[in-house]
Amino acid sequence: MDVLSVSEINAQIKALLEATFLQVRVQGEVSNLTIHKVSGHAYFSLKDSQSVIRCVLFKGNANRLKFALKEGQEMVVFGGISVYVPRGDYQINCFEIEPKEIGSLTLALEQLKEKLRLKGYFDKENKLPKPHFPKRVAVITSQNSAAWADMQKIASKRWPICELVCINTLMQGEGCVQSVVESIAYADSFHDTRNAFDAIVVARGGGSMEDLYSFNDEKIADALYLAKTFSMSAIGHESDFLLSDLVADLRASTPSNAMEILLPSSDEWLQRLDGFNVKLHRSFKILLHQKKAHLEHLADFLKRLSFENKHHLNALKLEQLKIALENKTLEFLRFKKTLLEKISTQALTSPFLQTKTERLNRLENALKLAHANLKLPQFGAFLSKNNQAIELEALKAGDKIELSNEKARASAEILSVDRV
């Protein structure tokens, strides 16, 4: 048996293994994952409960993965055995990698959903409210599609005053994602302008999952989330549920259903308005009756208030005049009394003083009459006897009296007096 060098035996092993295991499919759990930022190559191990094998995924193949490779994932790798002669190491050179039990597209979608969920794309608080009465709606679809025709038909019946604007868009195949993203951005560019759209509806009819899968793309999700205009996703049929349905502000099961959800029914609103009119008329009549009664009550109150207030003011003025006159009278009498006390006893018999005394008595009687005048009722008269004021209760039968007021004077004789 020939003696081989280390290099020779490794070279023979390389030739044998690479020829024998040209294509293999191996299942295991991903561990020790390292992705080189510069080269883009991924290095990892695939293990089961008893053994481990190293793997490499070069950049070209890594770029074709639709999902992110992570530690702990159960994967099936497809590739060939390669041997590194200088170290005698062997590994699987991976051409493709698929998740165990589920497809790579499904895993990629689940990973994208989780990513967007963490960014808040599905949160209710980030959803815009549906407009109540849309006047202008942008429909992102193919202008030759049955979906567009159905949407126009339903809109014209439900809410004919709404203007539907079709933004012709490629809705499947290569270039679909970019076309949809550009159409969303175009419709949203009118936000806060005179020609702004009240809603953006992304719509297309049913199809295979391959036809609809473009609407699971992250770029479309970003465009819907970042739009400042209310958005709806109406892709496929009721059973089709896509990423755009989760990100849009509202989902409709079909394009036709989108119009039924978005647009109010004019017939229903006409019936409501009729009902509102009846209720408003009834409420107005009740309110008018209440206000009329209130005004009548207020008018009566103001009349009473005006009379009572005027009477109160007049009485107050009269009382003030009475008090003022009494004060002046007392002051005058005190003055005269003081003056008389200063006159000597001899002067009391003088004709001059007698004249003044008589004048003072007349003045006192006049003041009493004036004082009585303050108490005179509205239709009464002054009562005097011998030019002196006298109280009614002081009269007796046969007295001759004078009655006077501002307008007239009269003489009378008392026939009888009844004491109360």
Swiss-Prot record:
Gene3D superfamilies xrefs: 2.40.50.1010
InterPro entries: Exonuc_VII_L, Exonuc_VII_lsu_C, OB-fold_nuc-bd_dom
Keywords: Cytoplasm, Exonuclease, Hydrolase, Nuclease
Principal cellular location given in the protein's record: cytoplasm
Subcellular location: Cytoplasm
UniProt-listed Enzyme Commission number(s): 3.1.11.6
GO molecular function, one term: exodeoxyribonuclease VII activity
Family label: Belongs to the XseA family.
Subunit structure of this chain's protein: Heterooligomer composed of large and small subunits.
NCBIfam families hit by this protein: xseA (TIGR00237)
Function per UniProt: Bidirectionally degrades single-stranded DNA into large acid-insoluble oligonucleotides, which are then degraded further into small acid-soluble oligonucleotides.
Annotated protein name in UniProt: Exodeoxyribonuclease 7 large subunit
